[in-house]
Amino acid sequence: GILMLTFGGLTAWAQRSFGRVMACGLAVEIGALLIQAGLGTVLSIEAIAIGIGARAISFGLLALGVSLLRQEFGSDEFDALRGAGRRLVWAPLAIGIGGLSLAGLPGTIGFVSRWMSIRSLALGDQELMMLSILASASVGIAVVRGLGALLEASPTPTPEDAPATLEMEAASRLETLRQLIGDIWARLKARALHLSVIAPAVTIVWMGIAPHTLALLAQSIANGYTFYR
């Protein structure tokens, strides 16, 4: 138990992914539970009983947040997720509540079990009590580092990058305008071709029908005039 607690505490703060932070936090919690079981006191048994439920909730929330990040961005590395928390709000919220509860931050559900563990250790071994506190703080530091990467603001362009950005935007607009003009020109050509085919056909039909129609009209007018007369 002491080895697992020490290993998890020494390595947790330096991790650069949420998956490794969870692994180190799990090592710390298993080590703490084994130490409490070795004490064999009533207070340590109560700490184990409450701690199992608190740790299950904490790990569940932390795993939920990490799962959301992996599903959306395909990674849980801090460097790959910089600023991702501003686009996926629920992930940093779940990681913050679960991770800080796992570290035993006051005001979270994990603080109750952590406080009972510290009290039981304080009655027997002061060194183990300090080791447990430092290991929990190491997990908390790792979680805070990860949250800082998630909530990091998007980098603003430097003055040297600004002209390049403006040139790219202008080129994009010119390309859009060129495509629009090309589309209009293609439509006009298609309409002109359509009219060039229809107009001669209409002319031919009209030239064939018009004389006969005019003759019939003249005959009708003449007949009408004769009848009324």
State where each predicted segment sits.
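Hydrophobic transmembrane alpha-helices and their helix-loop junctions in integral membrane proteins
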Residues: 1-115, 119-151, 158, 162-163, ...
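Cytoplasmic/organellar membrane-interface segments at the starts of transmembrane helices
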Residues: 85-91, 143-229
